[in-house]
Amino acid sequence: MNFLSTAESRTAQAAASGTTLLPQFRAPSWQTGMHSSAATELFATGPLPSTGTLPPSLSAYQHPTTFSNRNFATTSPLVLQDSTFNTTSNGILSHHDPLLQIKTSQGTVPTALAFERLGSSVLSNSIPPQSSTYRSAQESAPHLLQPQFSLLPSALGGSQQTPQAYSSTLFTSSTASIERALLRECSVIKHHQRPSGTQSIQAQLTGSQHSLHSYLSNSSVVNFQETTRQSSLSCSPIGDSTQVSNGGLQQKTSQVSVELAQSYSSAIPSSGYPPSTTKIKSCSTEQPLTSTKTPKPQSIIPPVQTLSYSKPLHNQSSVISGQAQIYSTAQLPSLLSVSQSQNYGLVQPHNVPSIVHSQVYRSSKVEKLPPLYKTLTFSGSSQTVTPENQTLNYSSNQQEVLSSVTNENYPAQTRDLSSVSQSQSYSSGHSQGLSPVSQTQVSYSSQSQVLSVVSLSESYASGESLTLTAPSLSYSSASRAQNLPDSSPTQNYISMHSSQNVQTQESSSPQSQKFLPAVQSSSFASSTHCQTLQNNITSPDPKSYAERKLDSDVYPSSKQEDGFPMQELQVLQPQASLESSTQRLSDGEINAQESTYKVSKADDRYSQSVIRSNSRLEDQVIGVALQASKKEESVVGSVTQLNQQIGQVNNAATLDLKNSTNLIQTPQIRLNTKDLKQQHPLILKVHESKVQEQHDQIINASSQIQIPNHALGHGHQASLPNTQVLLDSACDLQILQQSILQAGLGQVKASLQAQRVQSPQQIVHPFLQMEGHVIQSNGDHSQQQLHPQNSEVMKMDLSESSKPLQQHLTTKGHFSETNQHDSKNQFVSLGSMCFPEAVLLSDERNILSNVDDILAATAAACGVTPTDFSKSTSNETMQAVEDGDSKSHFQQSLDVRHVTSDFNSMTATVGKPQNINDTSLNGNQVTVNLSPVPALQSKMTLDQQHIETPGQNIPTKVTSAVVGPSHEVQEQSSGPFKKQSATNLESEEDSEAPVDSTLNNNRNQEFVSSSRSISGENATSESEFTLGGDDSGVSMNPARSALALLAMAQSGDAVSVKIEEENQDLMHFNLQKKRAKGKGQVKEEDNSNQKQLKRPAQGKRQNPRGTDIYLPYTPPSSESCHDGYQHQEKMRQKIKEVEEKQPEVKTGFIASFLDFLKSGPKQQFSTLAVRMPNRTRRPGTQMVRTFCPPPLPKPSSTTPTPLVSETGGNSPSDKVDNELKNLEHLSSFSSDEDDPGYSQDAYKSVSTPLTTLDATSDKKKKTEALQVATTSPTANTTGTATTSSTTVGAVKQEPLHSTSYAVNILENISSSESSKPIELDGLPSDQFAKGQDTVAIEGFTDEEDTESGGEGQYRERDEFVVKIEDIETFKEALKTGKEPPAIWKVQKALLQKFVPEIRDGQREFAATNSYLGYFGDAKSKYKRIYVKFIENANKKEYVRVCSKKPRNKPSQTIRTVQAKPSSSSKTSDPLASKTTTTKAPSVKPKVKQPKVKAEPPPKKRKKWKEEFSSSQSDSSPEIHTSSSDDEEFEPPAPFVTRFLNTRAMKETFKSYMELLVSIALDPDTMQALEKSNDELLLPHMKKIDGMLNDNRKRLLLNLHLDQSFKNALESFPELTIITRDSKAKSGGTAISKIKMNGKAYNKKTLRTSKTTTKSAQEFAVDPEKIQLYSLYHSLHHYKYHVYLICKDEISSVQKKNEDLGQEEIVQLCMKNVKWVEDLFEKFGELLNHVQQKCS
């Protein structure tokens, strides 16, 4: 496939390389490699490209990346090919082309969407095992995802669409299975990031592309642009980078087109490797270079790729493998191509080489950790970059580099990198810096590279910066990290300097970064760059210490891969390459932070691709503010830069420290930091001088904040830094910058110092941050969106609290805010970005005129407030500098754990998206909801991590558990804070700041997580919830408890925390479900709970969350929770007011969509149990939301976990997937009903089905161990209080204790206090439908034509399918009455989802507007299931599953039912009976009105009947009409006219004629068709034959034929009538004779029989009946007569055209339309005559 695709793309590389290959490659390649994942990704990709002309190719390009990545995971060589193919042929795009086309109208949002989607694939790529899982999930949900993407994006449109698509994807995936959900979460995160990159690119590409282009046009303009975009995309794994590239490309359609084409071309020429080399030289000419260059590197690299590819992939196993895979397989070709290769040689040539390099490097570097680290980073990235840069700078250099790369000498490549670095002082240096970053950055590379290339290409200001960087790089050439930092600063600088250009690239890069981080979730090498690097390094490092990495990978592959492996990898990486790695980390960290920040900033536009779309305005506003702030910051710029440098250095040091938790490396890193400080000042100065104001300030503010953020971000928050930077950049950044300017200068240092203290965390964070960045990119997007949307509010808040914020940010803020942003951003942003944030924010921003209202509503509904709150909280938290410091110290440990857990959260990217959903629904609640998903992923990961990182991150373990709870608690308390802050950001923030500070202080004191809970309040709210959910199965309260636990665990409670974490994790699994459900509920909960909870729930909520859940661990948390609750209540009230004013916020499409999205993941647990009741739709989720936290308490933490798991949708099992999907559908169709306002009503209306669904799902979960939270074998959450009000309430919890708890969501408030077990007696009964022993599934049931019985009508034409993997579950569920998996109606290439419902105690399935693709490999994953249609109610079809396969044809009695006793009815009776005997189609020709309108075409059988009747008598239309009305089941003449007048009948007849012509040409045709069960022509032949036969039998009723006469009529094809004129004229009983002769023939083959024919025979007949005999004869021999006519036609055609093949003759005959139509008319006349005679 790859080869073909590659070859094809080569041929079609020019313009439609992507497009051409798309369709072809689509199904096989991505599907083979990772169909589900690929499909989803493709889908995502689809939307991205659709925005522009280029997008399709890009998409194709990207997808190849994705695909190759997956393929890689699947097959190393395949991946290599795929990667090559991807680069060249854009096979993935091919896959996605239709999707892309489908989403073409979506524009930017789709791009963002695609980006998200890509992110998904990136994540999945990054986690190969996950990738597989992801693939699996997407296998089940790819179609769903695709259609959903399609539907969601189109419905939402704009940025909202993106989030929707993302959420959809996320959720759909997530529904697939917990594991899948996890994978998908990661994927989603990546997707999420991808859109940011794309949007960023799109937004900035216009500017930056132009500068980029102008520069790149020299040699790599297109390349570079592509690089930028693709780099962005690259960051997310190949697919991602392509996507981002796409996004960028879309912006620059023509240029991008060229680039893309070139990219493809270059990729295409991969086989033409030598040319590519030569062309690489040509690379100076950007396009030629690209295409040529790419081919060469590709050719060269593919081998290496294959080799190293396989290795890295395999070695990297999950994270590294995923990353390597992504980078190597998908990313490298696509990513590098896009990102690095694109950068250079248009990434095409270089891309391939770059990609190849990256891949190769990855592979080889993966094998050789240091080389991979360097080469991968450098070689893949750097070299790619270098070649690109060189290409840009020097053709020859590039060639050299390419040669090296091509040579794929890892050393050589490394040398190349070094050489490039040196030879291309900045290009190379940047490249090198980039390189490390580059892979690090494949996101970064893409960023760095792009930056470097962009830098170079962008402006030599960048170049200067880069040059400086290059020197810096040279300085730190020993330590690539420094180069990276240089690169980063340059990058940042460039990004900022080129503002849009660079930012575009950077955005692209950041996205790449984000993606990379996501992709490289395994290692968050320094920041984005370092992270990517470290990821790469991790790839390489793990290769070096592959086992370590693999260990990491193993966990990563479980999802920890992202979280833990990153840390471990980070540790390993620094160890593996302490000098370069450490330096790289530190530099990379700085870079990453700067770059991350830049990226964040740039990503601010994109990074929140959704946010970008949504917050673009705000971003722009922020941009203005930022620029204003930048001006301020330019003053502070140096200081900030210095601080940043220091902070970065510290960060780098911390990064390393945190990364490896290696104090050993800390010194190195610190040395590096010093170096960095030394270098960085230069770099920063250069940056300052060039992009100083924009870039440095942003970098400074962002770097500073981000560094703190990174530090605070702990890996998870590492991405948060991006987010935070994004937030900062959008909102906070301005404020932060201002604050930094104001308090930042002094505090930056303080924060830097704090960072130093936190630096270990920060170092890890950067790594994690990288991934976090990716995730954060997603989260960041949302958060940034939130902030951008809240930017004004936040600005006010920040301005008000900017100093405290700055203080916090700088000191504690780094942790707090980072934590907030990280944890919140991570998840919120993902969630928000994915859908809620982007959609809600964007939508609300557009819809709501009041920003504050929007913020409040969004905060409450979308989690915007959480972000705002995050900021305000972080401000407050920052105010508590001491807190911040202590917190930061504490958080170092905590952060480390958080990194792990955060990373896990990140790993649970799906959770993040869910968080986003949750966030969009309810800042807090949504966050909490989201957290469960991460919890799911993270939970396992966390547990593994806890196990895995005990030595390294015992705190991490504790932190994970603690952080999880802390996050949850924080979110719970922060939710209110956030909401309140969102609502009263300006006024309340100050007041809240103290509260938050207090709360935060308490939390800080409680646990390092505390800071998280403060800043994490928002961040943790979402992110931390996720973390909390992830880390601690507990949803929110666990977070606080976790904080306390963390504190305790740090001392020695790690084990207990771990246990709790495990419980929490379990809970989180459940929570995920609930969260998924809760998402939808969040909004309603927001409204209804605002009302209900405000009074009872305030205390209860606070208590349950803070006290109940936290009490076990720390009362202080509960207090802060209380405050948070109060704030939340306020926010909720505000939101409620807003919603009341503007219902669309909560009820409109947004709410609906949010619900839908939420339902998709079904893994969100509400932050506040109180909110849980709101959404009936996803009881499980709501339940999770409500009481995941209470479960946190050690004793009941597991138990509550089942609460979360109550939905059972989170369970990895297919059933859970189905249930989640069902719930999702439920939510989707009930989302409007379940508005918070009338959640009770909604609950009543939906609760029964939901409860039944939940009950069934619970049962299934139990039986199938599908339970998510109850992942603990015994813990099966039977509580399926799916009632929106009692989401949590109805949850039956069979946690580890296996005790069933039912937390009544309705009693959420009270249940919040104490998850009261709700009686599930009623619910279960409601949830169970009457059992059905057997299910009619094709191949699983008897094929006898037995009547299936039961109500409903069986329609042969309507095909329903069920997933093969779900069949057993399905049967079991129907038997037990539980909720079965969904079934799907086949609609051409789509599957429409039908979700189970219970109506009148019967299990029925209702149509939804969720669709999956149904083509390629997907068709082999489903089996037909027989259903009967019950009714069409509320515009929904309801069907039931048959217990036995229904008869093909309706029973004769039905058919022969005579509507009227007219003559036609008489004839219709026989006809009907005859029809029955003949075939369903012919049998069913019911006598209907001959009117054309009589039967709607949908009912084919009716059509057939019409056909039949019309053919029977065309001449008696009126009679037919009258008779047909009543005689629907009779096959009387009436159909004929109507039927014959239908297009369907004409087509049928045409096919009939075609077959007869074929038979006339080749008598064996018929036998061959019958043997092969032809479905194209045979059915038409049978239909016509059936009609003829039915009419003939009708005539027989009127003709009492003598047997011998009958035999003669049927034997002889020729009939002559002999009459006596006199008698005939007189009309007497004249005796007429009929003479029959002719040669007998075989009725099947129509060949003349060889047997001697009897002599002609004559029969005397009644003259009045002669016509009937003649009609009977004509009907009987009609086929033969037409056959003879066909022979004549064929002979006439052959005379005119000799030497024609059969096909051509058939076509020529059929082209004679008049001939065919004449025959059709005669056929109609014949049937009409029959009808007339029989009527």
Curated annotation (Swiss-Prot):
Keywords, alphabetical = Acetylation, Chromosome, Isopeptide bond, Phosphoprotein, Ubl conjugation
- UniProt lists compositionally biased (Basic and acidic residues) regions at 1120-1132, 1492-1508
Post-translational modification Phosphothreonine, affected residues: T949, T1341
Provide the function of this protein.
Answer: Plays an essential role in the protection and maintenance of transcriptional and developmental programs. Protects many bivalent promoters and poised enhancers from hypermethylation, showing a marked preference for these regulatory elements over other types of promoters or enhancers. Mechanistically, cooperates with TET1 and binds to DNA in a common complex to inhibit the binding of DNMT3A/3B and therefore de novo methylation.
Originating organism = Homo sapiens
Q: Which GO terms describe its cellular component?
A: chromosome
**Where do the coiled-coil regions begin and end?**
none
Pfam families assigned to the protein according to its UniProt record, in alphabetical order: DUF4211
Q: According to the UniProt entry, which residues carry Phosphoserine?
A: S586, S615, S886, S987, S1211, S1230, S1231, S1239, S1348
Q: Which residues carry this modification: N-acetylmethionine?
A: M1
Q: Where is this cross-link: Glycyl lysine isopeptide (Lys-Gly) (interchain with G-Cter in SUMO2)?
A: K1058, K1083
Q: Where is the composition biased (Polar residues)?
A: 267-297, 971-985, 997-1024, 1449-1478
Q: What is this protein called?
A: Glutamine and serine-rich protein 1
Give me the ranges of the annotated region Disordered: 267-301, 414-440, 479-518, 533-561, 964-1033, 1073-1132, 1178-1217, 1256-1286, 1441-1532
**Subunit and interaction comment:** Interacts with TET1.
Q: Where is the composition biased (Low complexity)?
A: 417-440, 1269-1286
Matching InterPro entries: DNA_MethProtect_Complex, DUF4211
Compartment(s) where it occurs, according to its Swiss-Prot or TrEMBL record: Chromosome
The yes or no answer to whether the keyword Nucleotide-binding is present is: no
Record keyword Acetylation present: yes
